[in-house]
Swiss-Prot record:
Family according to the record: Belongs to the amidase family. GatA subfamily.
Gene expressing this chain: gatA
EC number assigned by the record: 6.3.5.7
Keyword Nucleotide-binding attributed: yes
Annotated function: Allows the formation of correctly charged Gln-tRNA(Gln) through the transamidation of misacylated Glu-tRNA(Gln) in organisms which lack glutaminyl-tRNA synthetase. The reaction takes place in the presence of glutamine and ATP through an activated gamma-phospho-Glu-tRNA(Gln).
Superkingdom of source: Bacteria
Catalytic activity line of the entry: L-glutamyl-tRNA(Gln) + L-glutamine + ATP + H2O = L-glutaminyl-tRNA(Gln) + L-glutamate + ADP + phosphate + H(+)
Coiled-coil spans in chain: none
One Gene Ontology biological process: translation
Protein name: Glutamyl-tRNA(Gln) amidotransferase subunit A
Length: 501
């Protein structure tokens, strides 16, 4: 019987099949390329180049034949189109960069290529990572594989949909205010945002530099740990990358997987783990179906030996206005480079240089990006800087301190990723504030720079996936992954697939 990726439930199984020569990297790449073509209606990918992909796959097979294979050699991966890539376009989902091809690879792309992984293509995303539904892309919205009439989440919606639909076994994403965790939740997959500075931002098209962080998206916690091993590490080319002296040491993120905590048993592997439940995450605004799935997951953790402890994150509600002051301010600065002079879109007709600037930016940016540039420029302007931007930064510090007080009472914080399941396409596009409110449970983690992840924990309204959010202290990814892996060993939510996939 010929090999099929449908029989594989994890990257380790895929890697084992490649190592055993059950399937070649080229055969695997061809299978996934065919799937991408068949599922074009999902609009998960912006750019696919079969020749480039197959060339990488053949190189991976040759590397294995020479006995030089790494653990992930030959494993396919899709890259969010915010990472620049040689050969493939790098658009950030925008008309402004519609035909841009980078002369270099982002560090994340470079490191995964060095591990022997094979690029399947570039995934769709909200323009410049600004959005929670993947409806802001210049290349059209991505559809959720569980229900094509609903959003997959954003801004890494293309990556989430690609993994959920079986178009890629793994993908990269970025998380500025929840853009890995929320689409992972909406699409029924696993995703992790590492501690800010763990993964290099070099070659990642910037939205908000003090918040943007790359991370992996896949089916399981073990998959994400393997991918983090390839992605993470200090990068001298990124000034925000954490050097070893400050905690950014290389580590094996799989080292605690399947290991009981000290003093625990195989039946209760998480005995002694204190799980903090923020009371602010379980109040008004959380839909009953999401709360039911999250509570059931927490009960499963109790069976695994963990103890539930109530904690407080009192500034949770303020995370929305704080984020939507700081992030647009940084975007206003970062996106000023797109002016039509050096690269990207340029207006076809203009009178002079100033007219070219105006027309280029008016034509090149979408409505949501323009909105955030305007907000960001306003809060940075003379007379408003102290009232808005400076105040937001002060509250950001308080939010980070609140987390540290909570971690004095617990080891890991858990709760919902989003207040609801994925909504219908077009349902919130006319009301930006309602769209922003969907990020209330993920923004504070990003503002504090903490690691956070989403794991599938059930289904809600319309049989749509629900994600459980796990938040750890700085550099505590291994413990987060251990807790997520233990849950996935005891449940099968991560094995569920959309019927049409």
């Amino acid at each position: 019987m010929p090999f099929s990726a449908d029989s594989v439930t994890s990257l380790r199984q895929l890697a084992d099949a490649l190592a055993a020569r059950t399937v070649s990297a080229e055969e695997l790449a061809r299978e996934y390329l065919a799937r991408i073509e068949q599922a074009a209606a999902l609009n998960a990918f912006i750019h696919v180049d079969a020749e480039l992909t197959l060339a990488q796959a053949r190189a991976a097979d040759e590397r294995r034949a020479r006995g030089e294979a790494a653990p992930l050699t030959g494993v396919p991966v899709a890259h969010k189109d915010v990472f620049v890539t040689r050969g493939w376009r790098a658009t950030a989902g925008s008309k402004m960069l519609g035909n841009y091809e980078s002369p270099f690879d982002a560090t994340v792309v470079e490191r995964m290529a060095a591990a022997g992984m094979v690029t399947l293509g570039k995934t769709n995303m909200d323009e410049f990572a600004m959005g929670s539904s993947n409806e802001n892309s210049h290349f059209g919205p991505v559809r959720n594989p569980w229900d094509a009439g609903r959003v997959p989440g954003g801004s890494s919606g293309g990556s989430a949909a690609a993994v959920a639909a079986g178009l890629a076994p793994a993908a990269t994403g970025t998380d500025t205010g929840g853009s890995i965790r929320q689409p992972a939740s909406f699409s029924g997959i696993t995703g992790i945002k590492p501690t800010y500075g763990r993964v290099s931002r070099y070659g990642m098209i910037a939205f908000a530099s003090s918040l943007d962080q790359g991370g992996p998206m896949a089916h399981t916690a073990e998959d994400c740990a393997l991918l983090l091993n390839a992605m993470a590490g200090f990068d001298p080319k990124d000034s925000t990358s954490i050097p070893p002296a400050q905690g950014g040491v290389d580590e094996d993120y799989t080292r605690l997987l399947g290991q009981p905590r000290a003093g625990a048993t195989a039946e209760r592997p998480l005995a002694g783990l204190r799980i903090g439940l923020p009371r602010e995450y379980f109040g008004k605004g959380l839909s009953a179906d999401v709360e039911q799935a999250v509570r059931a997951a927490l009960a499963e953790y109790e069976k695994l030996g963990a103890t539930l402890v109530e904690v407080s994150l009192p500034k949770t509600e303020l995370s929305i206005p704080v984020y939507y002051v700081i992030a647009p301010a940084e975007a206003s600065s970062n996106l000023s480079r797109f002016d039509g002079v050096r690269y990207g879109h340029r207006a076809a007709e203009y009178r002079d240089l100033l007219d070219m600037y105006k027309k280029t930016r008016a034509e090149g940016f979408g409505a949501e990006v323009k909105r955030r540039i305007l907000v960001g420029t306003y809060v940075l302007s003379h007379g408003y800087y102290d009232a808005y931007y400076l105040q937001a930064q002060k509250i950001r510090r308080i939010i980070a301190d609140d987390f540290q007080r909570a971690f004095a009472q617990c080891d890991v914080i858990m709760g919902p990723v989003a207040p609801t399941v994925a909504w219908k396409l077009g349902e919130k596009t006319s009301d930006p504030v309602q769209m922003y409110l969907a990020d209330i449970f993920t923004l504070s983690t990003s503002l504090a720079g903490l690691p956070g992840m989403s794991v599938p924990c059930g289904f809600g309204e319309g049989n749509m996936p629900v994600g459980l959010q796990l938040i750890g202290n700085y550099f505590d990814e291994a413990r987060l992954l251990q807790a997520a892996h233990a849950f996935q060993q005891a449940t099968d939510w991560h094995l569920r697939r959309p019927a049409k996939a």
